[in-house]
């Protein structure tokens, strides 16, 4: 974890090179806290353009700005790719602390009724564990899910967790759920055109 007063987006490639050489945080999944959050999406699953999703455009840009290894290398997402995350605390691009950490793709999901990916946190992240992001076709609806297994990644987040980290994580999750719903439903409005 690195903390800055200035936006680091012009230095993302430098941060990417650093984090590509860092290890995934060790964890035992059975000892992590599990949470599943979901959002129904009013759009036919088969008509969704998943490009935004596989480019990690999940969180609103005032919360997390990211830099993905596969975009840096002009290709599609692969297992082992690193994502640099710049978190804005509070969620405002200008008037905030900029916290930099990273995650690594450990699974890509490409099933007929389920698309998504998962990543694990890299050393220095505020959490340790794994997050799974999927858009799924259930019996009658399309659902976006965020499924996490995590614990605080360092002493600071362990101490601040109940007061700050957990409420902020819930806030970010709600914003991500709404953001993906909005992006997909905009596709529907655009396709009706």
Regions found by a protein language model. Name each.
Residues 84, 116-118, 143-145:
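General beta-strand recognition
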Residues 121-167:
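Beta-strand/loop substructures that line and gate deep hydrophobic ligand-binding cavities in soluble
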Residues 1-91:
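Hydrophobic ligand-binding cavity/cleft-lining segments
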Residues 153-193:
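A conserved amphipathic terminal alpha-helix motif
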Residues 40-42, 91, 111, 125, ...:
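Residues that cap or initiate secondary-structure elements
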Residues 92-94, 156:
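A generic structural signal for short coil/turn motifs at secondary-structure boundaries
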């Amino acid at each position: 974890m690195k903390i800055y007063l200035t936006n680091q987006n012009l230095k993302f490639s430098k941060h990417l090179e650093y984090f590509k050489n860092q290890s995934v945080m060790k964890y035992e999944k059975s000892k992590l806290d599990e949470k599943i959050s979901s959002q129904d999406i009013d759009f036919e699953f088969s008509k969704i353009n998943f490009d935004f999703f596989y480019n990690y455009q999940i969180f609103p840009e005032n919360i997390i700005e990211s830099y993905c290894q596969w975009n840096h290398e002009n290709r599609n997402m692969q297992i082992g790719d690193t994502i640099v995350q710049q978190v804005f605390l509070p969620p405002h691009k200008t008037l905030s602390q900029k916290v930099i950490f990273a995650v690594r793709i450990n699974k890509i999901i490409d099933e007929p009724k389920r698309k998504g990916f998962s990543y694990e946190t890299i050393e220095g992240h505020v959490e340790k564990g794994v997050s799974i992001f999927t858009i799924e076709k259930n019996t009658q609806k399309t659902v976006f899910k965020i499924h996490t297994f995590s614990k605080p990644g360092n002493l600071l987040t362990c101490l601040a967790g109940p007061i700050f980290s957990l409420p902020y994580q819930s806030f970010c999750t709600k914003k991500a759920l709404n953001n993906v719903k909005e992006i997909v439903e905009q596709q529907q409005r655009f396709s009706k055109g």
